[in-house]
Amino acid sequence: MARQFSLENTRNIGIMAHIDAGKTTTTERILFYTGRVHKIGEVHEGAATMDWMEQEQERGITITSAATTAQWKGHRINIIDTPGHVDFTVEVERSLRVLDGAVAVLDAQSGVEPQTETVWRQATTYGVPRIVFVNKMDKIGADFLYSVKTLHERLQANAHPVQLPIGAEDQFTGIIDLVEMCAYHYHDELGKNIERIEIPEDYRDMAEEYRGKLIEAVAELDEELMMKYLEGEEITKEELKAAIRKATVSVQFFPVFCGSAFKNKGVQLMLDGVVDYLPSPVDIPAIKGTVPDTEEETVREARDDAPFAALAFKIMTDPYVGKLTFFRVYSGTLNSGSYVLNSTKRKRERIGRILQMHANHREEIAQVYAGDIAAAVGLKDTTTGDTLCDDKDPVILESMQFPEPVIQIAIEPKSKADQDKMSTALQKLQEEDPTFRAWTDQETGQTIIAGMGELHLDIIVDRMRREFKVEANVGAPQVAYRETFRKSAQVEGKFVRQSGGRGQYGHVWIEFSPNEEGKGFEFENAIVGGVVPREYIPAIQAGLEDAMQNGVLAGYPVVDIKAKLFDGSYHDVDSSEMAFKIAASMALKNAAAKCDPVLLEPIMKVEVIVPEEYLGDIMGDITSRRGRVEGMEARGNAQVVRAMVPLSEMFGYATSLRSNTQGRGTFTMVFDHYEEVPKSIAEEIIKKNKGE
């Protein structure tokens, strides 16, 4: 099957926004107008095409970025719907990595919201060109020019309207096109009957003023246009379009559109904007990569006759076909049934079938070309961020960086049958989501799962129940405490049992002392003259190590201590390895009274980014959580606060930060070191653990 759409006529775009700005509805309308969906699905009915996981329909939020293909005016548009909730930034990061352009959807009443700031920053990091769609113009309080102002003030974005709305709220009846200098009037509910009209008289002056501002803004980035503008020559609409496209593709300018996806207004014109102003795979710089063995840098041009190279950006488990690997082809072509090299893992993979996804129905295709986004069936070893390429011409494309998980909970299956299903489920979910981890805690034998936030883990547990039919009980978020000694002391451990027959006898004197942080446990044998025979020494060390797993204060592992065995005694008949092992563990228990044991807790390095006006509240909040502020700096129009805070005080912080900053703050945290728990708090933990 030959290529249907040329590379120049292909657009790979993402739709990004704050939660609830109307992103999924906008995507729905795009699919409706491009003829992919015959009945429009509403999110509040729980039936939107893109939100195809059951949970998304219930919660009305988009969790996984479904990729879908649509056609508009002779162009193929591949759309990736991205989630707007802060716990799912990993999904946004990975979709931005493989896109060529994006549509940022704003709510006309709120303008730029916090998650818009986060996603916008991510898009800037990856150099993704954007157009802006100010949605919900029919909503009470909708204000187009205010929304444009927030783009300047909160994002410092060089954004200018290429359209103006006619009316707002329930009076929103049409749109003025500032490039073509005409207007569009809507007559019916579905917004299919659009009438192109002259700009209404009462809007004429405003349209002239904003067209002037648009030309001025674009001319600053285009010398030829600047000369014409300064000499007062007429600038044609073709020249203006070409200049806007050039400035948008080079990420120096962001055209702003308006409409109401829910009321079916403005979506087709915004689609024209995608075709007119967002880049095709040919317009963006060729992707960089390295040659596996020589580490030389190389590039892959977006051409069908170049060697094949693609990036796997998402793994999904599909109930019918099993594991789906979504990938973006950067160069070359790929046929189903062929073999490729996974250069990241150095393994050959067979491409079973290639599917083009449309939200949740799929079409099988024989071949994909440079610039396409598709899903492959049959890949065994490929995970998110891996490169797939021609094994005769290997390359590793730069992968994606994912943050470490910050919150963990214990989870246990409700029955034996759930146990086996649970380990399969956890393995599959980890393949899909690089920010989710699962492991078994050696000390308690519990299964621990960790992720990016409480909502993230809620959804994981929910998916285990729905997709893998695993019923599990979930614990509260936990902190891994430790214990150590602060003083040195000589301690005796004696175990004697002699009541007829063979007895038990073990007797040791051990000097315990604190070790440096991070040095662990050191054991020294200083016995002279054989008062304790050599064959019992390993048993004494093993006895100490076993006893250290359950500490003397609250049962947490003891770390960073030294133990020096310097004296003891034995019995010819009754001594045994077991007796000395027990004597050693008794010595450790007796040390509790003399060695000043203390509790240690993990301290996290926290970075909070907040708008200036919330700085005071945030500093107060950190102090109330026993945090130490280590430094501050301004970044753009936000303040960055760096602090050390105990992990136990950070639970629920995301929620509290959201409410303290009206959702405009973000934070990251990583483990830094262990530190002594203050006495009053330690006493509470010890009481709780002893069940008092």
Swiss-Prot record:
Chain segments annotated as coiled-coil in the UniProt record: none
Positions contributing to GTP binding: 17-24, 81-85, 135-138
Chief location of this protein within or outside the cell: cytoplasm
Any Gene Ontology CC annotation: cytoplasm
GO molecular function terms attached to this record: GTP binding; GTPase activity; translation elongation factor activity
Residues annotated as domain tr-type G: 8-282
UniProt keyword Iron-sulfur, yes or no: no
Localization terms from the record: Cytoplasm
InterPro entries, alphabetized: EFG_II (IPR041095), EFG_III (IPR009022), EFG_III/V (IPR035647), EFG_IV (IPR047872), EFG_V (IPR035649), EFG_V-like (IPR000640), EFTu-like_2 (IPR004161), G_TR_CS (IPR031157)
Keyword annotations: Cytoplasm, Elongation factor, GTP-binding, Nucleotide-binding, Protein biosynthesis
GO aspect biological process, one term: ribosome disassembly
Family to which the UniProt record says this protein belongs: Belongs to the TRAFAC class translation factor GTPase superfamily. Classic translation factor GTPase family. EF-G/EF-2 subfamily.
NCBIfam families in alphabetical order: EF-G, PRK12740.1-3, PRK12740.1-5, PRK13351.1-1, small_GTP
Biological role: Catalyzes the GTP-dependent ribosomal translocation step during translation elongation. During this step, the ribosome changes from the pre-translocational (PRE) to the post-translocational (POST) state as the newly formed A-site-bound peptidyl-tRNA and P-site-bound deacylated tRNA move to the P and E sites, respectively. Catalyzes the coordinated movement of the two tRNA molecules, the mRNA and conformational changes in the ribosome.
Stored PANTHER family: RIBOSOME-RELEASING FACTOR 2, MITOCHONDRIAL, TRANSLATION ELONGATION FACTOR G-RELATED
Name listed for the protein in its UniProt record: Elongation factor G
Organism: Anoxybacillus flavithermus (strain DSM 21510 / WK1)
Lineage: Bacteria, Bacillati, Bacillota, Bacilli, Bacillales
